[in-house]
């Protein structure tokens, strides 16, 4: 058995600048879609600038497919679902997916640096409307810089499509907070956009609908009007030539904060025309972590060397206890699978990723991909700065003696106030 000493990952891996420096604000990993759409200068450049965003983004198979389909819809190609539902776990890549769609539609050439995206459709000038249901106030609406107020989700969507041509089509509907019918929405998507493609991104729909129930409108409520609009919108987009709608819902009833009935009702409103999308699955989280936390691609020779060394040790131990030829073959096969997975995960030990994905996800507070990024970034910064890194960053290498890392871990698990 080889006695070669493996180099610590911190001596081999180049970290992303904000991980290296430890400048890890919540805004770096928690994407604010509405702020991105508004080009808010407070949004980190890595999220606000399309080229920087896609340089730091790993396109999973499902995200690639989603981008390809939506851009094709906006180009006017047929045979694609124009209404798509994102159903992801809390922190499971939903906001990042919506931001990817926003940047791709607004600046298609930002994808040109990604080989697998070079043949995606180029729809030209796209009118993009973003509705953030967590931020948009159901009672007071949204006040513009000129003092005017947009009262409803349909008013805000129309304003973003075109304040001069689209918004007047629903101005009275917005004022009275009455949902426009299908004919008006159809005009909104065509005449209101001056014939340009239209992409509508709806985030946190459930949260807005829940608050809208408290706003009375004669014998109705804003929630009822919003549900009518949502259903009409999905139907009209589904039958359009150059429009697409992507909306998000929570993954489960537990994440719906007890409003299971409303979740099911919203789900049903678009069930005839929408199609489910899950942007991140399985081990696709590994290159996502690498792309965002590392400043360059992992060193292939180092990854190969480390994974082969682990394979040698684990296979040797299993073969030592194998009693039959079949068990020895199984030990060899499991060793190869471990080697391949470790090489793909480098500089992370797959066991650490599995703990977060399979155990921590049972904790309501843990935000999946986003939480993993924040926690791993704090670990890598600490080990790079203070030393102590091993060949891989695994469960046994987490620097829990570092106060910042320990606080970050407890916060991600929602128990920071218990200690």
Locations of the language-model features?
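Phosphate-handling catalytic cores of nucleic-acid transaction enzymes
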Residues: 46-47, 53, 105-118, 216, ...
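Flexible beta-alpha connector loops of hexameric P-loop NTPases
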Residues: 57, 138, 142-149, 213-224
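C-terminal helical "lid" subdomain and adjoining coupling/linker elements of P-loop NTPases
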Residues: 197, 214-215, 244, 300-419
């Amino acid at each position: 058995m080889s006695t070669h000493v493996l180099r610590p990952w911190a001596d081999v891996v180049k970290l992303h600048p904000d991980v290296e420096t430890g400048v890890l604000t919540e805004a770096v990993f928690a994407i604010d879609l509405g702020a991105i759409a508004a080009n808010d200068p407070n949004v980190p450049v890595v999220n606000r600038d399309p080229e920087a965003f896609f340089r730091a983004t790993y396109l999973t198979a499902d995200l690639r497919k989603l981008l390809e389909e939506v851009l094709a819809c906006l180009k006017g190609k047929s045979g694609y679902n124009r209404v798509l539902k994102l159903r992801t776990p809390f922190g499971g890549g939903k906001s990042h997916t919506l931001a990817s769609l926003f940047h791709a539609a607004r600046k298609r050439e930002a994808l040109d640096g990604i080989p697998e995206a070079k043949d995606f459709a180029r729809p030209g000038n796209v009118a993009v409307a973003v509705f953030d249901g967590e931020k948009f106030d159901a009672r007071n609406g949204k006040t513009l810089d000129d003092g005017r107020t947009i009262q409803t989700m349909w008013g805000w969507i129309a304003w973003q499509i075109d304040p001069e041509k689209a918004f007047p089509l629903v101005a009275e509907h917005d004022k009275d907070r009455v949902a426009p019918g299908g004919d008006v929405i159809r005009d909104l998507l065509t005449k209101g956009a001056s014939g340009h493609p239209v992409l509508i991104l709806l985030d946190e729909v459930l949260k807005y609908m829940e608050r809208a129930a408290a706003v009375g409108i004669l014998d109705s409520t804003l929630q009822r009007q919003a549900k009518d609009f949502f259903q009409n919108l999905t139907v009209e987009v589904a039958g359009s030539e150059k429009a697409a709608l992507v909306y998000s819902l929570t993954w489960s009833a537990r994440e719906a904060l007890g409003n299971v009935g409303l979740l099911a009702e919203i789900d049903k409103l678009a069930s005839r025309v929408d199609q489910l999308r899950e942007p991140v699955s399985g081990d696709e989280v590994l290159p996502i972590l690498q792309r965002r936390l590392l400043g360059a691609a992992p060193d292939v020779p180092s990854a190969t060397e480390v994974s082969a060394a682990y394979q040698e040790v684990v296979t040797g131990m299993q073969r030592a206890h194998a009693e039959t030829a079949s068990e020895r073959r199984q030990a060899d096969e499991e060793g190869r699978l471990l080697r391949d997975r470790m090489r793909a995960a480098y500089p992370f030990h797959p066991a650490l990723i599995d703990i977060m994905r399979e155990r921590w996800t049972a904790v309501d507070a843990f935000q999946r991909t986003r939480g993993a990024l924040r926690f791993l970034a704090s670990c890598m910064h600490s080990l790079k700065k203070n030393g102590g890194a091993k060949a891989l960053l695994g469960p046994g290498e987490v620097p829990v003696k570092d106060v910042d890392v320990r606080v970050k871990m407890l916060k991600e698990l929602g128990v920071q106030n218990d200690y």
